[in-house]
Regions:
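Small-residue-enriched core segments of transmembrane alpha-helices in multipass membrane transport
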Residues: 61-66, 213-222
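Juxtamembrane membrane-interface segments at transmembrane alpha-helix termini
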Residues: 67-76, 222-224
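Hydrophobic transmembrane alpha-helices of multi-pass small-molecule transporters
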Residues: 39, 93, 222-223
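Short active-site segment of divalent metal-dependent hydrolases/proteases
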Residues: 77-78, 117
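Non-catalytic, topology-defining segments of multipass membrane proteins
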Residues: 1-63, 72, 97-212
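Post-HEXXH active-site segment of zinc metalloproteases
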Residues: 82-96, 130
Length: 224
């Protein structure tokens, strides 16, 4: 049994679709301005209350806002957040780091995903949430804070680590052009460098704060 891309496709009014697809730099700045305003606000409050009883609820709020970054990633990947291509790409790379999604790998795999959604026959759609064979325990762990760490080898960070060492996963071999693979490796190494820098800051300042502000939010906030 397999899934392919043959299914019902509704008719769309092209004029209405064009109106809905209109892009605006102002709307993009407004969205990201509000987003980062609240992210910085709750991050600053977490810093001020670090070690007190108020830390946990503020950190949960901060992490939940941070974990919205995949939505920002998705819109900037499609270049719909802004009218300007450069602005989309800048915020795409920022959102990619926040979401632990190496930008070049995901640009190509997401393009394939939209062309062959849920395809399991032949070339595989690697963005399927429930892969075959299905692991329901792993699926439900996604809805528990830090549940992803029960399966560390299935996290996005582990994939980036493999790419940083030059080991290309099946999704890259299948979706990315040959000339892009070295860029994926380079970007992955940059991500790992930034992670090491954050951990080093925590060690230097003898504080867990940098780790909880930049590395933990996806594990804590995404399930919430």
């Amino acid at each position: 049994m397999h899934a392919d891309d043959t299914w019902f496709k509704p008719e769309l009014n092209k004029k209405i679709l064009k109106e809905l697809s209109r892009r605006s730099d102002w709307e993009g700045f407004k969205h990201f301005g509000i987003y980062f305003l609240f992210l910085f606000l709750f991050g600053f409050l977490t810093y001020l209350t670090w070690g007190s009883l108020l830390t946990l609820p503020l950190l949960v709020c901060y992490s939940t806002i941070w974990a919205y970054s995949p939505s920002n990633w998705h819109e900037t990947l499609h270049r719909t957040a802004f009218k300007n291509k450069l602005l989309n790409d800048i915020f795409y790379y920022v959102s990619s780091f926040m979401a632990n999604m190496e930008p070049v790998r995901w640009r190509w795999s997401h393009t394939f995903h939209h062309s062959h959604t849920l395809q399991t026959h032949g070339d595989y759609d690697h963005e399927i949430q429930l892969k075959r064979p299905t692991d329901l325990i792993h699926f439900f762990c996604q809805f528990i804070p830090f549940g992803q760490l029960i399966y560390p080898h299935k996290t996005l960070q582990f994939e980036i680590l493999k790419h940083s060492m030059g080991y290309l996963t099946d999704v890259v071999k299948q979706n990315a052009p040959e000339k892009e693979k070295s860029i994926i490796i380079r970007n992955s190494r940059l991500f790992v460098f930034l992670w090491i820098l954050i951990i080093s800051l925590s060690i230097y300042y003898s504080s867990w704060l940098p780790i909880f502000l930049f590395l933990v939010p996806n594990y804590l906030g995404a399930p919430l």
